[in-house]
């Protein structure tokens, strides 16, 4: 009887341990299946065609590219809207995990953030009223009033013009309105964004174009904290260019 009881207890204990191990394995597998990387992505939704609102929905070149890369890598994206000049502070404070907002990679910005490889190259385009014959080149802007978007490379470009009176705006639409009302003389903006304003405002024309001084638009992450994620997006940018998705976006948003 004693031998039988001992054998029973040994067998029961073995079955119990196996059951526990199976349950633990199933729970781990379930947890792994339910674990999804979530990234809070900051953007300034007033920079058409890269980031803007259409029927109250966030859209644009950057938005579509981020969503495509995220979908292929099982990443959930939570969009966080803010002003352009507030994006890096939001990144540094942990309110967002990355920036996707037509941000140019520069040495100054690299002091506080890391960038992916560039996904788009752009230029500066200068706008004026069609009936303003006094502005023909960049040199004609000396001492003039120039509208720009706050925190952009174009703001730095305008400030470098001799005696220029630079008006920095959180939204370029404000600058366009000021130009149409003769409160400023010109606007300096990213060429693709500027072309959108030209299409919507026939009284405006471009009169000068130049490189923007940056290395191209890139996605930004907090300094030395997201190396693995940066590699995912670098690979995603390459894949988008080889599988045709990138060209689809270029045509969709009428970019060069």
Curated annotation (Swiss-Prot):
Localization: Cell membrane
Lipid-binding residues (covalent, S-diacylglycerol cysteine): 20
InterPro entries associated with the record: SBP_3_CS, Solute-binding_3/MltF_N
Single GO biological process annotation from the record: amino acid transport
Signal sequence residues: 1-19
One Pfam family hit: SBP_bac_3
One Gene Ontology cellular component: plasma membrane
Record carries keyword Transport: yes
Record key words, sorted: Amino-acid transport, Cell membrane, Lipoprotein, Membrane, Palmitate, Signal, Transport
Domain of life, source organism: Bacteria
Mode of membrane association: Lipid-anchor
Keyword rRNA-binding attributed: no
Lipidation (N-palmitoyl cysteine): 20
Sequence similarity: Belongs to the bacterial solute-binding protein 3 family.
PANTHER family in the record: ARGININE-BINDING EXTRACELLULAR PROTEIN ARTP, MEMBRANE-BOUND LYTIC MUREIN TRANSGLYCOSYLASE F
Chain's role: Involved in histidine transport.
Name of the protein: Probable histidine-binding protein
């Amino acid at each position: 009887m004693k031998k039988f009881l001992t054998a029973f207890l040994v067998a029961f204990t073995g079955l119990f341990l196996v059951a526990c191990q199976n349950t633990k394995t199933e729970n781990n597998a379930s947890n792994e299946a339910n674990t999804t990387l979530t990234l809070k992505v900051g953007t300034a939704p007033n920079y058409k065609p890269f980031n803007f609102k259409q029927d109250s929905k966030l859209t644009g070149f950057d938005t579509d590219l981020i969503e495509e890369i995220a979908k292929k890598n099982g990443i959930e994206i939570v969009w966080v809207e803010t002003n352009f000049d507030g994006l890096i502070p939001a990144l540094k404070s942990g309110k967002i995990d990355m920036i996707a907002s037509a941000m140019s990679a520069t040495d100054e910005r690299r002091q506080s953030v890391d960038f992916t490889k560039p996904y788009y190259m752009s230029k500066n385009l200068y706008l004026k009223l069609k009936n303003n014959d006094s502005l023909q080149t960049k040199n004609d802007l000396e001492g003039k009033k120039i509208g720009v978007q706050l925190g952009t490379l174009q703001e730095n470009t305008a400030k470098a013009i001799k005696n220029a009176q630079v008006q920095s705006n959180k939204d370029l639409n404000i600058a366009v309105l000021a130009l149409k009302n003769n409160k400023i003389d010109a606007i300096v903006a990213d060429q693709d964004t500027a072309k959108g304003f030209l299409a919507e405002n026939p009284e405006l024309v471009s009169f000068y174009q130049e490189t923007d001084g940056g290395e191209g638009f890139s996605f930004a992450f907090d300094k030395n904290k997201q190396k693995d994620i940066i590699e995912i997006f670098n690979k995603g940018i390459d894949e988008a260019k080889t599988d045709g998705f990138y060209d689809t976006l270029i045509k969709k948003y009428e970019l060069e």
